[in-house]
Curated annotation (Swiss-Prot):
Chain's gene name: ddl
Binding site residues for ATP: 140-195
Cofactor(s) essential for the protein: Mg(2+); Mn(2+)
One GO CC term on file: cytosol
Record flagged with keyword Nucleotide-binding: yes
Protein name: D-alanine--D-alanine ligase
Source organism: Paracidovorax citrulli (strain AAC00-1)
UniProt binding sites for Mg(2+) 1: D267, E281
Signal peptide: none
Job of this protein: Cell wall formation.
Protein's cellular compartments: Cytoplasm
Covalent S-S links between cysteines: none
Family: Belongs to the D-alanine--D-alanine ligase family.
Keywords: ATP-binding, Cell shape, Cell wall biogenesis/degradation, Cytoplasm, Ligase, Magnesium, Manganese, Metal-binding, Nucleotide-binding, Peptidoglycan synthesis
Amino acid sequence: MAAGLPETEIDVRALGKVAVLMGGDSAEREVSLMSGGGVLQALRARGVDAHAFDPSQSDLSELKSHGYARCFIALHGRHGEDGTVQGALELLGIPYTGPGVMASAIAMDKIMTKRIWRFEGLPTPDWRLVSSAAETAQALEDLGSPMIVKPSREGSTIGLTKVTSPGQCEQAYRLASRYDPEVLCEQFIEGEETTCPVLGQGAGAHALPVIRIVAPEGNYDYQNKYFTDVTQYHCPCGLPEQEEREIQRLVVEAFRTLQCRGWARADIMIRASDRKPFLLEINTSPGMTGHSLVPMSARAMGVSYEELCLRILAGASLDARQGQVDAAGHPGAA
């Protein structure tokens, strides 16, 4: 599945005037600005007529009045990858990168995502939805220690706590509930942390190389993700070939199950006791910073950051456009 990306010719002129949506008003604004800045520079280097656009500073209706032909969504978190901006772009009739309205909304909600994956028979850790510190303590009793407590609809490990004792439950619940009234308690899978990007859509969706993540003392938090160099990323991942292929198969199935398109990145834990992979979540607007993982995975198969950005942009589409043809001459979303 990761043998190589399909060969494609992209007519830069056919892309038209492009808005790189960045910033926004979520808790991940700072990271979004870094992602968007990198994408903007890469697209301009390839001759694309690309411009920065911050939805928290300008009304989205200006995209139409200013003649933008498509959008590269580099927004993270609420209003950027939860179906909100995707719905607005559908109404404006401006094609955009990444999954559509429904897939974006579902993937942003970790609980709904896990329910669908579980229904489809895909492996994901056991969980509880809680609404109080007392319920969090009960979840710890049910799921065992350690346990992960996190907001249902945030990313970048924001609001996340690894709980190892009942005394931590109240503080963990309070932190998570600051970001979302729906708090997820999830069984902790002891083992190796990996992540794997997916590009394409439907039968054409394909996984990129798996990345194995080794964080200091297992602490892969917001700071270590974006602002330090202490976390180690292994790509090639160094896993047995059969394990990597199984992870790639699993993430493509998870991607298709949620009806994603364009691109996404799924996080997986490999349980140490039996080497079984478990899906944690899927990110439908992955980071594109200097520390980000999709560009790292693409580089491992010979695809540069600039080429990756161009390919993602060329696949911009709309839910409402059946049979649309993109700048690479491929059919759009069905």
